[in-house]
Amino acid sequence: MSDPHNAGPDLIVIPARNASTRLPGKPLLKIAGRSLLERVVAIGKAAAAQAGDCQVLVATDDDRIAGHAAELGVAVAMTSPDLDSGTVRAAHAARECASPPARVVNLQGDAPFIPPGVVAGLMQALRRGAGDVATAVFQLDWPRLDRLRAHKREAPFSGTTCIRAADGRALWFSKSIIPAIRDEARLRQQPLSPVWQHLGLYGYTRAALDWFAAAAPGHYEALEGLEQLRFLENGWRIDTIPVEVPPHLLSGIDTPEDLAKAEQAIACNGDPFPG
């Protein structure tokens, strides 16, 4: 069990695999002249500076990605290619730190448009005692929900939605859009839909992260392809932190079409690259 009283700086881990089934080699692919990894590393560095007492680390199983991360001036942890998820990769990377951290934020390596302030805010929520597991969500207005529905017709496993209790506790996550909405025409008179979308961002205490790495994958986790369901299937509480995100924010880069849309978003809305 980790001891928070003898911990090192908090850690932002960026898991980055080369062997994506839908978009092989994606950490090294470029969006508007910068690699996907470069964009996410810049987000991590800016967030660490905002949060304070925090370091950034890329966790990978690929020498090419490790070399590129070194060029970007970020620490690297080499992990086994046999690890079954980015969260387990983050856990193994945290253990390699000379002074393992008390808190870890897992910033997915395919999420190049998350504002650094959102990442820093999640770390700060963990420090305030938000719980053992926390994640960021944002409520969709109707145009955003319509865009998500259209996107899922092309890429049904892109984008994750969440059902929350009144106190912010996550009840469920799904690659389907939940909840189903009855009497939508009436609800559309309100500015916001009842759908919350999940960002590719998680925070854990070391105790929760170590438990996850040792636990077997859950049944619904495997069906949905969502790591966080391992916690819910085993009775853990996940706190959801509502955040504000830019209207043009995209979900993770999973397909060649996502890459093209990311290029288009930058062309239309400007480049959010920190720096």
Locate predicted features:
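Short phosphate-binding loop-to-helix
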Residues: 63-121
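Conserved core of the sugar-phosphate nucleotidyltransferase
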Residues: 114-215
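Short, high-confidence coil segments that cap the C-terminus of an alpha-helix
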Residues: 53, 99-101, 128-133, 236
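Conserved alpha/beta core of the MobA/IspD/sugar-nucleotide pyrophosphorylase nucleotidyltransferase superfamily
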Residues: 173, 186-275
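Hydrophobic/aromatic residues located in beta-strands of well-ordered beta-sheets
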Residues: 12, 55-58, 104, 170, ...
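A short acidic, helix-capping loop that chelates divalent metal ions and anchors anionic groups
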Residues: 20-25, 144-145, 211-212, 249-250
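N-terminal glycine-rich phosphate-binding loop and ensuing alpha1 helix
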Residues: 3, 8-60, 116
